[in-house]
Regions:
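Membrane-proximal intracellular helices of multi-pass ion channels
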Residues: 1-476
Length: 476
């Protein structure tokens, strides 16, 4: 039985067209930065923007919507949207910087997915417009390309709901998806303004404050400085950055409850509680067992756990870290922070669900026959299906991680550093052991691109896309 046919592809194409229009609008915005700083590369942004707007308009207008939007369509749209966004960003960098496609695609996929890995050894030599493009891509990608477009271009209804779920989001702040997305938007914008103001109060220049807020709140982590946040040598800047990383890694539902004054609900959120516990435990382990300085420890633990990838240490300093500290950070990068936030990786709720599932199974075996044991997390009932789904996803996650790690090791990179790099790419983190570079061979570079893409979409949608395309074309 075929589950996807040509009619489904028409529906996917129609909604993909809307996303392409949104991407075209986003990549045109750095033109204003280019004008302000007198850069003569306007056509590098304008032409790709018009390509995206034009192609999107054609698909949206002429593709018939032959069936109602279902989750499979949303997943396929999301997968293709991230690829298209990376492609359009690549065209800009190829034109503006005269670099090859693979490096341009890597940089843009890293930015859009909030991974934060960069092929540039000296970002300070890049045009201001390109730096802003990277920051803007991370800020948009932090929410999700599809989520952003739902809030602006797609009318409320079933289609919006299916597309919302396609980017691994399921929480609802408001009864309708449209109002949920708008609320998320306003929270995100409010925190963005707050971040810019706080950075400004530390004495940071406006351009730096804008870019650092966009990248750290979105848990993207790319910097406009070669030394990342370490460039500023300021405790105040470090504190603001840690605050933004934690805000970015916290569920938007918790932010909404905080804004509404529901402090009891905030304090009893299990993901927030687990975040505090993990930050405390991993920092203590890094300081007292790994022998790493306290500030360096807590900063990078928060950076890794929130999947931001911001750093206050140079790459050579990070490569020289004790193996124990690298293992601590790898663990953080695998776990991530809250579902329903801008963070990547497995996410705390899945880890808790699986651990609780194991505990409940042990207690079921030990309990008297006929006993009924309540299974709840944060007051919500947890089904066998949810436990299996969490376990299955974590299993898939480690299979992909092993694949990426194997590719890097085969190319001669240190096994521990390769695991660090693979976990960073797949968790959309951005901390690097220096493996990612302009001269990284094509095969490991493509493996990291695939890992970033799959990690951002949480694997299943990509499998749905591949299966769907195969079925549709087999059907003729």
């Amino acid at each position: 039985m075929r589950y996807v046919g040509k009619r489904d592809l028409f529906t996917v194409g129609k909604y993909l067209g809307t996303i392409m229009q949104g991407v075209g609008f986003v990549v045109a915005l750095p033109v204003f930065v280019a004008i302000i700083y007198g850069e003569g590369n306007l056509q590098s942004f304008i032409i790709p923007a018009f390509i995206s707007l034009g192609a999107g308009t054609v698909l949206k207008r002429y593709m018939p919507e032959e069936c109602s939007v279902r989750l499979k369509h949303g997943m396929m749209v999301a997968c293709l949207a991230w690829l298209w966004a990376g492609l359009i960003g690549s065209l800009i960098m190829i034109s503006a910087l005269n670099i090859d496609f693979t490096n341009a695609f890597f940089e843009n996929m890293s930015a859009w997915t909030g991974s934060g890995l960069t092929i540039f050894s000296s970002v300070e030599s890049l045009p201001k417009s390109i730096l802003f493009l990277r920051s803007l891509e991370q800020w948009i990608g932090g929410l999700g390309v599809v989520i952003v477009v739902i809030g602006i271009l797609i009318r409320p209804g079933t289609a919006a709901s299916r597309l919302y779920k396609s980017e691994a989001r399921d929480e609802r702040i408001k009864p309708s998806i449209a109002n949920t997305v708008k609320t998320i938007w306003w929270i995100y914008i409010t925190y963005t303004v707050l971040g810019i103001v706080l950075y400004g109060l530390t004495g940071m220049p406006l351009f730096d404050a804008i870019n650092n807020t966009l990248t750290n709140l979105s848990t993207g982590g790319m910097s406009i400085k070669n030394m990342n946040i370490g460039y500023y040598h300021s405790a105040a800047v470090y504190l603001v950055t840690m605050l933004l990383m934690i805000l970015g890694g916290t569920s938007f539902l918790v932010h909404y409850q905080l804004i509404k004054g529901r402090f009891f609900s905030v304090l009893h959120d299990i993901q927030l509680q687990a975040t505090v516990v993990f930050i405390s435990i991993f920092t203590i382990l890094a300081v007292y067992v790994g022998g790493v300085a306290p500030l360096e420890s807590i900063y990078h633990v928060i950076s890794a756990l929130s999947c931001t990838g911001s750093s206050i240490s140079s790459t050579p300093q990070m490569v020289a870290w004790p193996a124990y500290f690298k293992v601590v950070l790898i663990t953080c990068m695998l776990i991530g922070m809250a579902a329903g936030s801008t963070t990547g990786a497995v996410k705390i709720i899945r880890v808790i669900t699986v651990l609780k599932g194991v505990y409940w199974e042990i207690m079921r075996i030990l309990a008297p026959e006929g006993s009924v044991m309540p299974r709840k997390i944060s007051g919500k009932s947890v089904s066998d299906t949810e436990i299996r789904e969490a376990g299955s996803y974590i299993s898939l996650y480690f299979v992909l991680l092993f694949f990426t790690w194997s590719v890097l090791v085969v190319y001669g990179y240190d096994p521990l550093n390769s695991l660090f790099e693979a976990a960073s790419a797949q968790g959309n983190v951005g901390l690097s052991m220096g493996i990612t570079s302009f001269n990284l061979p094509v095969v490991p570079k493509m493996a990291l691109i695939l890992s970033m893409w799959l990690g951002r979409l949480e694997i299943i949608p990509v499998i749905v896309l591949i299966r769907g395309l195969v079925e549709a074309f087999k059907a003729g």
